[in-house]
Amino acid sequence: DINGGGATLPQKLYQTSGVLT
C-alpha cells in the first residue's frame, strides 16, 4: 500500500496494487 489510506474505494484498490502514488 502506497498512501496507506484516505482515498476513495477504487483509488484505494489501485494504491494497494501499487498503481497510484
Swiss-Prot record:
Record's miscellaneous remark: On the 2D-gel the determined MW is: 40.2 kDa.
Enzyme class, first EC level, given as a word: hydrolase
Entry keyword Cell cycle: no
Predominant cellular place of this UniProt entry's protein: secreted
Location within or outside the cell: Secreted
Name of protein: Cutinase 2
GO molecular function: cutinase activity
Induction text: By contact with cutin.
Glycosyltransferase recorded as keyword: no
Catalytic reactions on record: cutin + H2O = cutin monomers
Family: Belongs to the cutinase family.
Protein task: Catalyzes the hydrolysis of complex carboxylic polyesters found in the cell wall of plants. Degrades cutin, a macromolecule that forms the structure of the plant cuticle. Allows pathogenic fungi to penetrate through the cuticular barrier into the host plant during the initial stage of fungal infection.
EC identifiers of the protein: 3.1.1.74
One GO term describing the cellular component: extracellular region
Activity modulation notes: Inhibited by diisopropyl fluorophosphate (DFP).
Keywords from the UniProt entry: Hydrolase, Secreted, Serine esterase, Virulence
UniProt organism field: Colletotrichum gloeosporioides (Anthracnose fungus)
